[in-house]
Amino acid sequence: SEMCIRDRSITDNMFLGREIRQKGFMGSFLKFLDKKAMADEARKRLSDLGLLTIQNINQLVETLSGGQRQGVAVARATSFGTKVVIMDEPTAALGVKESRRVLELIGEVRSRGIPIILISHNMPHVFEVADRIHIHRLGTRLCVIDPKKHEMSDAVAYMTGAKPVSYTH
């Protein structure tokens, strides 16, 4: 699922529903947006996450790579007092390099103390970034495992039913 509006700029995507209005009559009455303040703030947020490889903050999101789009979505998600970030298959359909950048972003967001719920079938990625793994099958949580104490093959065996779950780890 797309996390950005493709035919809008990076800045517009960063401020969806939270646009900064101009000061005074132009902003309060005529509702004019302060595009410069929005661009400056978007640039700062992307820079904070190490994402300023993007040349033009006003370029359309559809011109970005999949990894860059994920970066814009993560920057937006962490910019407005977010208490938790939910990422559903964030590396699906991305190349190796872009997937690596998304995993780095997850680490950067976690280092700020923002918890992340990562929904993924990519076990190497899950084991790399998770501090605990909730394993579900057919809509029911089977168990919670610690990736430092369990092998990836254990997780896959629980998911597929090859290994019965007799207790929560």
What are these regions (language model features)?
Residues 1-2, 6-167:
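Glycine-rich phosphate-binding loops of nucleotide-dependent enzymes
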